[in-house]
């Protein structure tokens, strides 16, 4: 398929720069994947679209404040470090700016000196492998010294960094938030439980590759980035039980969807406790094995994310719905409004 088939006109003013004051005050577009019919609502009414016995699957990853600003120990030159992937213990793959200042053996000091990074290997495109040395607990030091790596299309500074975390975030490791989950409040989750909806959790640590544009003219040639995922025994058992009893499985976000489809594809449609790295690329023509519907935000033109959504609801239905969203001035991307596909 040609990349241009997933393009649409998006005015820049519709890219949400800040989150709404109330998480569930965002608008909700409901898209019928069979007919393409669209209805408009608010996210606080999401419970109306669920039935007893359905299961909502959430990604409980937590975003690292992964952007660090430090200086070279020998010269005092300023250096910016972005954590990409934990390799082993205190060893990380990072992105450094300006990369030319950091050679193998360079020591970078952050804050008051309780965190240091030693460059152990030079990679291409500004990549560097480093080993951290610190006093105390690494993630606590990072929380006090690091900044949130907001998506490139968000230009505003975030006043409250918790607004770039879901209310159920738990497992630290993402470079970006699973943004479909940002709309949920604890009260909304409680209301779903009271209605008899099961709530299950998976973990997928979102990498910065999620913002990487698809550049191949034919989308089949695009290579997805790999991301770490995990599903425990409790979630696997819950999902298999829901499926057996005829309930629907609704994933929250493309990250939850990719995790569920990775696991179900590997086990003949069943769910099993597992962990590993997934680079699954879902686009039209894909047969879904895990989910019946999903909640997601409004995505970038020509992105792998709009291709996944198109695989579930049909490209023509999705583009028609997106054009209506533009006309109705929905807010787009990470801090934007939501879509329920069912």
UniProtKB/Swiss-Prot annotation:
Transmembrane segments: none
Species, as recorded: Bacillus pumilus (strain SAFR-032)
Similarity remark: Belongs to the QueA family.
GO molecular function: S-adenosylmethionine:tRNA ribosyltransferase-isomerase activity
Subcellular location: Cytoplasm
Gene3D superfamilies in the record: QueA-like (3.40.1780.10)
Catalytic activity from the UniProt record: 7-aminomethyl-7-carbaguanosine(34) in tRNA + S-adenosyl-L-methionine = epoxyqueuosine(34) in tRNA + adenine + L-methionine + 2 H(+)
A single GO cellular-component term on record: cytoplasm
Pathway info: tRNA modification; tRNA-queuosine biosynthesis
Subunit structure: Monomer.
Keywords for this protein: Cytoplasm, Queuosine biosynthesis, S-adenosyl-L-methionine, Transferase
GO biological process, alphabetically ordered: queuosine biosynthetic process; tRNA wobble guanine modification
Listed EC numbers: 2.4.99.17
Protein name as it appears in the record: S-adenosylmethionine:tRNA ribosyltransferase-isomerase
Keyword Ion transport: no
Highest taxon above the source species: Bacteria
Protein's job: Transfers and isomerizes the ribose moiety from AdoMet to the 7-aminomethyl group of 7-deazaguanine (preQ1-tRNA) to give epoxyqueuosine (oQ-tRNA).
Main location: cytoplasm
One Pfam family recorded for the sequence: Queuosine_synth
């Amino acid at each position: 398929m040609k990349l241009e088939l997933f393009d649409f006109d998006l005015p820049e003013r519709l890219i949400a720069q800040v989150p709404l004051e109330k998480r569930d005050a965002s608008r909700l577009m409901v898209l019928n994947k069979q007919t393409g019919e669209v209805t408009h609502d608010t996210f606080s009414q999401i419970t109306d679209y669920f039935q007893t016995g359905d299961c909502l699957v959430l990604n409980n990853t937590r975003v690292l404040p992964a952007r660090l600003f430090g200086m070279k120990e020998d010269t005092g030159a300023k250096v910016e470090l972005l954590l990409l992937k934990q390799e082993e213990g205190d060893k990380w793959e990072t992105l450094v700016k300006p990369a030319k200042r950091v050679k193998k053996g360079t020591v970078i000091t952050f804050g008051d000196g309780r965190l240091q990074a030693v460059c152990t290997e030079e990679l291409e495109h500004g990549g560097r492998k480093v080993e951290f040395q610190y006093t105390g607990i690494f993630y606590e030091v990072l929380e006090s010294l690091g900044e949130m790596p907001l998506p490139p299309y968000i230009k505003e500074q975030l006043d409250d960094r918790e607004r770039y975390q879901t209310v159920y975030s738990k497992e630290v490791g993402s470079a970006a938030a699973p943004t479909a989950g940002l709309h949920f409040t604890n009260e909304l989750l409680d209301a779903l439980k009271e209605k008899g909806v099961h709530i299950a959790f998976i973990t997928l640590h979102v990498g910065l590759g999620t913002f990487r544009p698809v550049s191949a003219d034919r989308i089949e040639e695009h290579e997805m980035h790999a991301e770490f995922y995990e599903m425990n025994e409790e979630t696997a058992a819950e999902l298999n039980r829901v499926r057996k009893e005829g309930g629907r499985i609704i994933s929250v976000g493309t990250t939850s969807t990719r995790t569920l489809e990775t696991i179900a594809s590997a086990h003949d449609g069943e769910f099993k406790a597992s962990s590993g790295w997934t680079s699954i690329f879902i686009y039209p023509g894909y047969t879904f094995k895990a989910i019946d519907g999903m909640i997601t935000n409004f995505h970038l033109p020509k992105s792998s994310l709009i291709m996944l959504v198109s695989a579930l609801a049909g490209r023509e239905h999705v583009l028609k719905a997106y054009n209506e969203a533009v006309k109705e001035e929905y807010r787009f991307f990470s801090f934007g409004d939501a879509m329920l596909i069912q």
